[in-house]
Amino acid sequence: MKGRKYTMKTGFNWKRKLLSLLLLFCLLTGLAGSGTMAHAYNVPDNMKWWADDKFGMFIHFGSYSYFGHGEWAMQTEGISKETYQKTISAKFDPEKFDAQEIVSYAKKAGMKYLVFTAKHHEGLAMWDTKVASFTDTTGQKIYSLQQYTPFGKTNRDIIMELKNACQQAGIHFGLYYSIIDWNHSSQTVEGDFTKLASWEARTAYIADMKAQLKELVDTYDPEIMWFDGDWTYKKDNPTLKKWWTKQDGQDLYQYMKSLKSDIIVNERVCRSFGLGDFECPEQSIPEKALSRPWETCQTMNNAWGYKKDCEKSYYNVRYMIQDLVEVASKDGNYLLNIGPKGDGTMTAGSRKILKGIGNWMNRYGDSIYGTSGTPFAKKPSWGRYTRKDNVIYAHVMKWPKDQKLVTKKYAGKKVKKVYLLQNGKKLKYNATGKKVIIKMPEKKPDKADTVIAVQYQ
């Protein structure tokens, strides 16, 4: 299993770094004001709900779930289009998929939004697409859940089921869409890249891709469109020319905004160019808050789509909670993935983790929702900070042996009270100089993270 990562390459220029330093200076000197949010970046109006929600569910689910070797199996195991269609997609029948149950678990875990894979790299559309070029290799059948698999006989629409369940639960709904399509006649997977049939095929494919995206927006009205599969370049192989460019990414972003002006779109319309509305580091956390909105997407067991071999490799609940807090302390969002099995049922491991996080969020959710990142430049040795209005939340992961927690004093403000967030019990403290020294209970209430609220006047 891969360990937690706290570094990443951002590709930002010096102007963005300067902006980050200026915003941090405002936080440290109290210029942001005690009654307003002070993010490390500007939050557009259409993204305020997203920035406040902080925590979402990612769902990787497709024909690869039936195979149980992960969503990249077609590529990693060298399976041809025809073989994949006949031996995997044609047998995919998720009759036990229960949108209400999945959304219920998301809500109880404290998740505020959800993103579902409408189409992953293997190309099977999880909705009843009408775009004619997306077929199997015979050209006779539309390659979709409804028209190609045994599940089609049910006349069910699992994306709409999820959409409706989210709406009932008050959870925001989003969709994932892969730019590359290993099944489409215009493309063939070759190693980690995708070979293009011709430049004429490229033009036709992009038009058809946009037609599918219009179907998704018109039918399901997603609030987020989460793109992926924007890599198509291999320098040492001229047959794998870079057929998806920055200009294509800009055009795709504008197209999505033309379909729905307030839709939130991630950077992977074409990554590394600062496009889209937010950055999305994958299974990694940046060392510092970024200069624009960002979201870490994370697996529970190092697998996105259902992978049998990873079912005994789940992280523990404590790890996942501390990951969430690490992200929130840096002003980011946390998109945590589940990969249902081929029949549509949730795995036991994902249920356990979601329940565990939910138990913690029931006590400490106020220290996550609607918060901004730490107002202090230095990380404490005992945990992390988040902030909301005039309250600094100390996330204590390492309990002080002498029962004295030393926290930084916020911007010369006067402390009003200090209390345990889980029950409101007041704690004794001594505010002196640049420190607030808090008398802690003898025993740590929560092993993963106990939150102490320091309220300022």
What residues fall within each predicted segment?
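Sec-dependent signal peptide cleavage junction
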Residues: T29-A40
